[in-house]
Amino acid sequence: MDGSSDNLIAVGRISGTHGIRGQLRLHSYSGNLESLQAAKNVLIRFPAGGTRQIQLKKAAYHSGKFLLTLEGFDTIEKAQELAGAELLLQREQLPPPDADEYYWHDLLGLSVVTNEGQALGIIKDILETGANDVYLVRDDATKREYLIPAIASVISSVNIHTGTMTITPLEGLLDL
């Protein structure tokens, strides 16, 4: 598995255990179970630092939760060691995103400007709100933050190659 950070995509966070046989609950960032099921190996990034490649034995959806079974983690005690860790896949293990869809990994760090050319800052985080994602944009120089809804009427264009997102802000969006 290529360990370069540009090739690795965080697809979820291990939120805890399920049962006593080492199954893990996964908070998926994408909701895409097929990519996980197709993966043979995953990379685990521990909260305290460091990574470890582990064979994925099974990925399933059960009672509204993603469940994983990893090689070598067959007891609840062993599985608890992974709580809070991020699950990473190689970009090649993921399907290409649809038109006008992007992996979070590709959006984080983009410069955000208005359609009138006003620089707002950098996408620092992406918040899941239920109806749509919200981009947390921060101008490090002024410490100002903006919450930009990820909706078609606001996001005018995204150019991953130039590292820029252009928005048409809703009235009052930038006044808060």
From Swiss-Prot:
Q: Which InterPro entries match?
A: PRC_barrel-like_sf, PRC_RimM, RimM, RimM_N, RimM_N_sf, Transl_B-barrel_sf
Q: Kindly provide the name given to this protein in its UniProt entry.
A: Ribosome maturation factor RimM
The answer to whether keyword rRNA processing applies is yes
Predominant place of localization: cytoplasm
Instruction: Enumerate the UniProt keywords alphabetically.
Output: Chaperone, Cytoplasm, Ribosome biogenesis, rRNA processing
Which taxonomic lineage is given here? Answer: Bacteria, Pseudomonadati, Thermodesulfobacteriota, Desulfuromonadia, Geobacterales
Briefly, what is this protein's role? An accessory protein needed during the final step in the assembly of 30S ribosomal subunit, possibly for assembly of the head region. Essential for efficient processing of 16S rRNA. May be needed both before and after RbfA during the maturation of 16S rRNA. It has affinity for free ribosomal 30S subunits but not for 70S ribosomes.
One GO cellular-component annotation of the UniProt record comes to: ribosome
Gene designation per UniProt:
rimM
The similarity comment for this entry is: Belongs to the RimM family.
According to its UniProt entry, this protein's organism is: Trichlorobacter lovleyi (strain ATCC BAA-1151 / DSM 17278 / SZ)
Compartments reported by the entry = Cytoplasm
Q: How the protein assembles, per its UniProt entry?
A: Binds ribosomal protein uS19.
Checking PANTHER family in the record gives: RIBOSOME MATURATION FACTOR RIMM
Pfam families per the UniProt record, alphabetical: PRC_RimM, RimM
Q: What is known of its domains?
A: The PRC barrel domain binds ribosomal protein uS19.
Q: What GO biological process terms are annotated to this protein in UniProt?
A: ribosomal small subunit biogenesis; rRNA processing
Limits of the PRC barrel domain? 99-173
Q: Does the keyword Cytoplasm apply?
A: yes
Q: Which GO terms describe its molecular function?
A: ribosome binding
